[in-house]
Amino acid sequence: MGNCGTRDEAAVFTPQAQAQQLQKKHSRSVSDLSDPSTPRFRDDSRTPISYAQVIPFTLFELETITKSFRPDYILGEGGFGTVYKGYIDDNLRVGLKSLPVAVKVLNKEGLQGHREWLTEVNFLGQLRHPNLVKLIGYCCEDDHRLLVYEFMLRGSLENHLFRKTTAPLSWSRRMMIALGAAKGLAFLHNAERPVIYRDFKTSNILLDSDYTAKLSDFGLAKAGPQGDETHVSTRVMGTYGYAAPEYVMTGHLTARSDVYSFGVVLLEMLTGRKSVDKTRPSKEQNLVDWARPKLNDKRKLLQIIDPRLENQYSVRAAQKACSLAYYCLSQNPKARPLMSDVVETLEPLQCTGDALIPCATTTAGAAFAMGGVPDYRMHRRFAKNVGPGAICRSPNPNYSPGGPAACRVR
């Protein structure tokens, strides 16, 4: 693999070696540390932890996989690098199976680029879920940083929503994608060591051949607050138009910051509009500013639904989806639902539209007509001043203090 750290560093740290390093650095602040079970990189480390499910590749092997990074193999380009399509042949190395892959080559931008690369390896090396893109391997050779992912045949949600040459996604498919992405975020937030994704947007939601949504690009992910901490303080990073307002203003990051970003993406899926579009009239350039006041108005919300979805959904389904987006986009983070609430709210919507997807059979489905929450009747008396901007409370700590868990009563 070559050397991707200093000369006296091993190419890859084992978890045991990392634990020994941590004991030596125990006096450092929490933000500088990780333990073998925590998906957080060490700020002084230049090499990833080794994981049984993640393969270390040589640069020569990845050149072979991508035909020397041929320009016509490029799948996309972004701020962190270029992604190429590749194919692992079973003759490449003993024990490897033949499969198509996506190879991301990071820009050579020094420490910051390396840290983002290392974050992806250390998060995706540990986290496995049907709605997270699978990290197959990596390469760390000299100043080269590469990542190898499973190949996602359908590309990004962004392309399907906004490319004029792409057939528009149906209502049922959009709801299916929204649910899959929500499950991915809920998994991160509910992990033993919670993870804040920090860069949830349509270009980071990839679709496989069955349109299963998978979150990709974990370069900005952060370990969530621990113990009595209420938030993580960090430099503001992400994408304009998706970042939560309180995070932009203060640098205070919580799981509810991701919920806001989810609300923006859901709004993009409902309207077919970009979060920020400078080609539109000035009052319509910021999607949230333009659409959110209409989301809770039954007379206006149908005016903002993507016209390409005409006759594909029921009015009731549109109201439910718009109401969910409304609360996800609350200015007050505490009024936003938890991602687990979002999942329960979206599950019953899988049986609407063109009925290609079977109806959900969860308890949430049975209670959905009454507000979208299991055991709704038991909790109804705890909702007060129900309506836009209301502060609602639930006796169950698994529910959010606002949003779908208690407030979406009409």
Swiss-Prot record:
SUPFAM superfamilies: Protein kinase-like (PK-like). GO terms for molecular function: ATP binding; protein serine kinase activity; protein serine/threonine kinase activity. Its main location: membrane. Its EC number is 2.7.11.1. Residues 1-45 are annotated as: Disordered. The modification Phosphotyrosine is found at Y149, Y247. The modification Phosphoserine is found at S203, S233. One of its GO terms (cellular component) is plasma membrane. Keywords: ATP-binding, Cell membrane, Kinase, Lipoprotein, Membrane, Myristate, Nucleotide-binding, Palmitate, Phosphoprotein, Plant defense, Serine/threonine-protein kinase, Transferase. Pfam families: PK_Tyr_Ser-Thr (PF07714). Residues 69-350 form the Protein kinase domain. May be involved in plant defense signaling. This is Probable serine/threonine-protein kinase PBL8. It comes from Arabidopsis thaliana (Mouse-ear cress). The lineage of its organism: Eukaryota, Viridiplantae, Streptophyta, Embryophyta, Tracheophyta.
